[in-house]
A protein has these predicted regions:
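Short linear regulatory motifs enriched in tryptophan with gly/pro/ser
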Residues: 1-225
Length: 225
């Protein structure tokens, strides 16, 4: 991802396209409005911002739910490839998956999540706020970055659609369809096993990751609109 990427996502509530930097504040307005419109709500929910460079998720987690629910969600949308182990960390210490959110989370708290202890994918989490809102879902997706405009590292003109997992280092290994065909002639590994799709996840190009199982409409390559 060496070209200048624009990271933005669509708000679940109003459908507006909002930049990564502004999304937390934007969602807060909607959540405060929900809280004010339902003053008798008893449930506690937490707005959590999950980030890996230009890729991000904003989710609303139910206080009664556990870290196991968020782990399952992250696996389905960003991580799962071969059933690797995963772990949440708070100030460097492990957080048990059975711990409930309302036992741990407070506004401003920062955590980390690690998937796969070999070819590791690490993301950061920050609790943006807590609200009195009744919610059925354990984890509700509020926003996710749209697919990033990752350019081919060979021609630097067309959008990349494939990755060579052997050559994916510092600005290399991303190919458009035409350049991927040429790279296949030069790289036996690419034709054999190293060709992988560009997907909207920080796990792309790693291990056997081929894409998520939920929110699949935003899991592909960038399309100009």
């Amino acid at each position: 991802m060496v070209n200048k990427l624009v990271s933005a996502g669509k708000c679940l509530y109003c459908g507006s396209m909002v930049t990564q930097r502004s999304m937390g504040t934007h969602l807060k307005k909607h959540l405060l409005q929900q809280e004010n419109e339902n003053p008798t709500a008893q449930g506690t929910v937490f707005q959590v911002y999950i980030r890996a460079a230009e890729m991000f998720l904003h989710v609303l987690v139910k206080g009664e739910a556990s870290f196991k629910h968020l782990d399952a969600f992250l696996r389905k949308i960003w991580m799962e490839c071969c059933g690797h182990l995963s772990q949440f960390y708070l100030h460097g210490s492990k957080v048990g998956l059975t711990r409930k959110f309302d036992q741990v989370l407070v506004p401003g708290l920062k955590l980390e999540y690690e998937y796969d202890f070999g070819s590791t994918t690490l993301v950061s989490l920050q609790v943006m706020g807590s609200y009195k809102i009744n919610q059925k879902e354990n984890v509700l997706l509020l926003s996710r970055n749209e697919p990033l405009e990752i350019l081919c590292s060979s021609c630097n003109k067309n959008v990349a659609t494939a990755i060579c997992s052997v050559h994916i280092y510092e600005g290399e290994g991303f190919y458009c369809e035409a350049c991927a065909a040429r790279h296949e002639e030069e790289c036996e590994d690419f034709a054999d096993y190293a060709s992988m799709p560009v997907v909207n996840s920080p796990r792309m190009g790693t291990c056997a990751y081929m894409g998520g199982a939920i929110d699949t409409e935003r899991d592909g390559v960038y399309v100009a609109r």
